[in-house]
Amino acid sequence: MVDFRKFYKENANVAYTVLGYPNLQISEAFLQRLDQSPIDILELGVAYSDPIADGEIIADAAKIALDQGVDIHSVFELLARIKTKKALVFMVYYNLIFSYGLEKFVKKAKSLGICALIVPELSFEESDDLVKECEKYNIALITLVSVTTPKERVKKLVKHAKGFIYLLASIGITGTKSVEEAILQDKVKEIRSFTNLPIFVGFGIQNNQDVKRMRKVADGVIVGTSIVKYFKQENLDIIMKDIEEIFKK
C-alpha cells in the first residue's frame, strides 16, 4: 500500500478538481502541468448525476462535465495520457464503480496510477466488497471521519484504514464553513490515539488563511470548492497562479 508521506515534506497540499470541468481539454492541460504546481496529492472528481456529498459549486461543475458527455470511459482515456510524480486519488461515487464492475474498476484505476479511492456515500458497514478488491490491487480505500463521529466509532473506522484519514472539517456538504479550530485539534488528537496514518483536513477550506490555520492542526489540507471555482475562468495560467496563492507557505 502506498505511503502518502513520500509525496510531501512537512505538510501535504491536497487539491480537488472535477475531471471534464470546464472541459476535458483544460483538465488535461492542468494535469500535464501538475508537476510544476505546489499540489502534492490531487483528488480527481468523477462527475456523477446525484452528488449527494457535494455543494452547489462542485455539483454544478459535475453537471457541466456530464452535459459535455464526460463519463468514466473518457476519464480513463484522459488519465492514460498523463504521467505525473504526484499522488492521484479518485473521488468517485459508489454507483459508478458498481456499474463499471468493482474489480474491473479498481484494476483499471491501478493501471492508470491511482493510489487511492474516496467513495463518500459508502458506509464502513457496506464497504467489504470494495475493500477486498482494493486490497487485491494495492489501492487504499480512504476512511472519512467527521468531527461529530463518536470516539468508539472513530476507533472502529480507523482500525483497518489505509493511506490517510480524511477528516471532515465541517458538518454537511462541501464548501460550507469550517468548525472551530479547537474542536478539530481535539478530533485530530483522538484519531492519532488510534492510528499512525497521516490526517488530512478537508471541507470548508476556502482561502490561504484557512490553509495556514489547518496546517497547524493536521498533516495535510484538502482544498476542493475554492479550486473548482478557479477553473470557471478557463485560463490555465490564472488557475495555476490562484493555486500557488492558496497553498503558499
Curated annotation (Swiss-Prot):
Keyword Amino-acid biosynthesis: yes
Pathway annotation: Amino-acid biosynthesis; L-tryptophan biosynthesis; L-tryptophan from chorismate: step 5/5
Keywords: Amino-acid biosynthesis, Aromatic amino acid biosynthesis, Lyase, Tryptophan biosynthesis
Coiled coil region boundaries: none
Assigned protein family: Belongs to the TrpA family.
Subunit text: Tetramer of two alpha and two beta chains.
MF GO annotations: tryptophan synthase activity
NCBIfam families attached to this UniProt entry: trpA (TIGR00262)
Catalysed conversion reaction: (1S,2R)-1-C-(indol-3-yl)glycerol 3-phosphate + L-serine = D-glyceraldehyde 3-phosphate + L-tryptophan + H2O
Enzyme Commission number(s): 4.2.1.20
Residue positions of the active site: E43, D54
The name this protein goes by in its record: Tryptophan synthase alpha chain
Keyword Lyase part of the UniProt annotation: yes
GO CC annotation, single: cytosol
Organism domain of life: Bacteria
A Pfam family per the record: Trp_syntA
Role summary: The alpha subunit is responsible for the aldol cleavage of indoleglycerol phosphate to indole and glyceraldehyde 3-phosphate.
